[in-house]
A protein has these predicted regions:
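Conserved Radical SAM active-site core
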Residues: 1-140, 144-148
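Auxiliary Fe-S-binding modules of radical SAM enzymes
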Residues: 5, 11, 143, 149-250
Length: 250
């Protein structure tokens, strides 16, 4: 009911999508999230429901003792229509072990997304850059995504996510410069040639920097949002109160 209360204030507004992500909660299982999705679907059948990172899904399915395909099918039957790309971070194990050892590994992340694609659910792909990784790690990450896209064609977009060093265990790592950011977007546009869309996260980059990315291969900005959970601001985003509607102008 608390989660539905977040949706209710937007009744009657021209929304197109609800995006559901959260942590790995030990008391919440797959059945809970299936019920949540089905209730949102019943309340606003016009909304597209995108939800749950591969990290969350990996935990749900293991807890339920289900295969990835069985778990994904349950969520799809409940009304889930697509997935975000969170939790990818950097695929290379030597980096992943240092920054997110407890998260699902690269093979697990890719399997969950491939399974979603096989069930006709589109997903997004991300890469967290600008921390302790090097250029070879970035190329390895993008290569694995490109290979899966060649196989399934199920990715909607690729979203590079700029590392922010506020309030985390890597606060001593300097952030990438705007020049480095723009260079990465341009390379991604050329290298990820089988992805129709390259998306920039304007809350993380800031509105002005996000506008610049449109001249470096980006063709979509993520997104028209209302940051009700404070997830962007708590992560040290450039935009501390990120809210943008279709009526706003950069």
């Amino acid at each position: 009911e608390q989660m539905l209360d977040i949706c209710r204030p937007y009744d009657g507004q021209p929304l197109t999508e609800v995006h559901i992500v959260g942590g790995v909660h030990p008391k919440m299982n797959l059945e809970f999230f299936c019920e949540l999705v089905s209730k949102i679907r019943a309340h606003r059948p016009d909304l597209h429901i995108k939800g749950f990172t591969a990290v969350e899904l990996d935990y749900m399915f293991r807890k339920a003792k289900l295969t990835v395909e069985e778990g994904m099918q349950k969520l799809k039957d409940a009304g889930l229509q697509s997935m975000p790309g969170g939790g990818a971070e950097i695929f290379h194990p030597e980096v992943r072990e240092q920054i997110c050892a407890d998260k699902v590994d690269a093979d697990g992340w890719l399997l969950i997304h491939e399974t979603a694609h096989k069930l006709s659910m589109h997903t997004n792909a991300t890469m967290l850059y600008g921390h302790i990784e090097n250029y070879a790690h970035r190329v390895d990450h993008m290569s694995r995504l490109r290979a899966l896209q060649d196989k399934t064609g199920g990715f909607n977009c690729f979203i590079p996510l700029k590392f922010r060093n506020k309030d985390n265990d890597m606060s001593d790592v300097p952030e990438s410069t705007i020049i480095e950011d723009l260079r990465l977007y341009a390379i991604a546009r050329l290298f990820m040639d089988n992805f129709a869309n390259l998306k920039a996260s304007w809350p993380m980059l800031g509105r002005q920097s996000a506008q610049l990315t449109l001249s470096f291969g980006v063709n979509d900005l993520d997104g028209t949002i209302d940051d009700t959970t404070r997830i962007y601001s708590m992560a040290g985003s450039e935009e501390q109160t990120p809210s943008m509607s279709t009526e706003d102008r950069c």
